[in-house]
């Protein structure tokens, strides 16, 4: 008997139908539970993809130091992958990210470099690149690395097509690095060009962990605008309220970006009929307990 390793359990996450939260009109709303991945988020997929493909090309080897700018989930997933495969991991992130995220990264053995929250992810990316230029490590660069969306082209997209028996009509995803929506869109559009791909962005002035609207100079290089059919904005208040509703009404303990995406999915469901709408639930709510989104 051959026993499996942790890498084998990244992906193949459940797809569940919402039972109590719905917009009627004969629509089916489905949640892809990416929090069921080993390190707890959708970012397990690209993290493992980037590390293992870089190894296969001879770009990195166990014992090397990896550096990455992150707002949370990619950092956690890379810290897990580094622990599994024998790398030192340095993560650069804004200091205002939740304490749960920081503790989880450190639990996996990662070193954290915190930057002022006023500088945001833009400053984190700049500092990571400066550290690389100083010879302190290798950046896998989730924002420009094609192995990020490939993980979803080869994993998330085929899973959704199979799990819906090809009936999916809408795919809704929050947008951060954009790897999830880029890779999944590419696969689904190859199967059925009529599938509507919907990207969620924060409203002006809203701060939602995991959802970004990047300045043009920092727009991820993996992002291809034509792969998204609709851009929908969501407020912080609506994202947080839907996050609480998912827990209380569906038993889905999700993060705030997942609440934002599901709010948009419900908005779409109120506008269409006989649709099969899939929304990505990026991670779990236990990473946000200190943020106040859930009642104490």
Q: Where would I find each of the regions flagged by the language model?
A:
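PLP-dependent amino-acid enzyme catalytic core
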Residues: 1-296
């Amino acid at each position: 008997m051959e026993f499996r390793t942790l890498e084998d359990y990244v992906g193949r996450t459940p797809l569940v139908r919402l039972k109590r939260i719905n917009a009627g009109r004969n629509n089916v709303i489905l949640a892809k539970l990416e929090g069921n991945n080993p390190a707890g988020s959708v970012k397990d997929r690209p993290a493992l993809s980037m590390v293992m493909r870089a190894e296969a090309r001879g770009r990195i080897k166990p014992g090397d130091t990896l550096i990455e700018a992150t707002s949370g989930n990619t950092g956690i997933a890379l810290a897990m992958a580094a622990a599994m495969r024998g790398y030192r991991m340095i993560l650069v992130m804004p200091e205002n990210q939740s304490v749960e995220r920081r503790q989880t990264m450190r639990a996996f053995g990662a070193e954290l470099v915190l930057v002022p929250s006023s500088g945001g992810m833009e400053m984190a990316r700049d500092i990571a690149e400066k550290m690389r230029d100083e010879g302190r490590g290798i950046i896998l660069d989730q924002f420009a690395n094609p192995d990020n969306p490939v993980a979803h082209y080869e994993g998330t997209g085929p899973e959704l097509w199979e799990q819906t028996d090809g009936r999916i009509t809408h795919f809704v995803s929050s947008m951060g690095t954009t790897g999830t929506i880029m890779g999944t869109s590419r696969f689904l559009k190859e199967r059925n060009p009529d599938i509507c791909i919907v990207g969620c962005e924060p409203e002006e002035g809203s701060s939602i962990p995991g959802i970004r609207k990047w300045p043009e100079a920092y727009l991820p290089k993996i992002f291809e605008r034509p792969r998204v059919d609709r851009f929908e904005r969501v407020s912080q208040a609506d994202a947080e309220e839907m996050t609480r509703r998912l827990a209380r009404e569906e038993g889905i303990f999700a993060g705030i970006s997942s609440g934002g995406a599901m709010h948009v999915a419900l908005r779409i469901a109120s506008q269409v009929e006989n649709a099969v709408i899939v929304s990505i639930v990026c991670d779990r709510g236990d990473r946000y307990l200190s943020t106040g989104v859930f009642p104490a």
